[in-house]
Amino acid sequence: MSKIYVIGVGTGSKDCLTLKAVEVLQKLDVLYCPTSKSDNESIAFSIAKDFLKDDIEVKNRHFPMIRDREKIKGIFKEMADEMKNDALSGKNVGFVTIGDPMIYSTFIYVLENLKDNIEVKTISGIPSFVDVASKMNFPLAFDDMPFIVIPSIADMEKIEEYIVEFDAIVLMKAYKNYGEIVELIKKYKLENNTLVVSNSSRENEKIIVGKDIYTDENCEYLTTIIINKRWKL
C-alpha cells in the first residue's frame, strides 16, 4: 500500500536522529525538503543528508513566511498532490522537518490535504525545548504543574497572560519579538527562571541564562525561550 513518510529530524544535530528516522530515511526514493527562502538549503535536509541513498531525488520546496493561510493554501495543496502522485507511482516518499512533525511544523498544512487520500506515517523527532531542557537539567514540568507551548508570534497581551497564568512556559521561534518578551521576563523578575537557546544542537548553538538574556541583541530565527517559575538556574 502506498504511503508517505514525514520524518522529524530533531533539534539540529544528526546525533539526535532516532533509529527509526534513520531506518526510514535510508529507504526513501524521493525526499521533500521545506525551505524558508527559495535559494536556501533546508535545515532539515542538512541534518538528514548523510543517511540518504546516493540516487535519491531531492525536491526543495519554498514556503513563504506569511501568516495568511488562505493565500498559501494553494501551495500546500499543490505539494500534497505532487507527493501523493509520487507515492502512487510506487516510490517511497518522505518529507523532513526539524523538531517533531506535529509541533508547529510546516507539514501540518500539507497533511490537511493528504489525510483523507493516502496513508501518512509520522516519525517523531526531538523538539528543541525538550533537548535543551534535558541538556541543562532544567525541568519543563513536575508535580502538578501544567506547562504551555506557544508560538512567539502570538499577540503580546496573550503572551503576558500566559506568563502570569502558567508556572512553565515554552515560547517557540522567539526571534520576532524577543525584546518584548525579555521585557516581560524582567517585569515579573523571572530572569533566573529562564533559559534561552538558539540553534539547539547545531554548531552555532547559543544558550543564554540569567541576566545575560538582557544583553543579547542578535536573536536567531530558531530561538526558544523556556520559563519555569518553580526552578531556578
Predicted regions and their residues:
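Class I SAM-dependent methyltransferase SAM-binding "motif I" and its flanking Rossmann-like core
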Residues: 102-165, 230-231
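A contiguous loop/helix-start segment that scaffolds small-molecule binding in enzyme catalytic cores
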Residues: 4-6, 163-233
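Class I S-adenosyl-L-methionine
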Residues: 2-14, 21, 26-118, 207-208, ...
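General beta-strand structural signal in soluble alpha/beta enzymes
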Residues: 33, 60, 95-97, 122-125, ...
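A polyampholytic, Gly/Pro-enriched intrinsically disordered region
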Residues: 78-86, 140-151, 213-224
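Short acidic active-site motifs
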Residues: 20, 82, 155-159
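Short gly/pro/ser/thr-enriched loop/turn and capping motifs at secondary-structure boundaries
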Residues: 38-41, 66, 127-130, 178, ...
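Residues at the C-termini of beta-strands that transition into short coil/loop
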Residues: 8, 35, 62-64, 124-126, ...
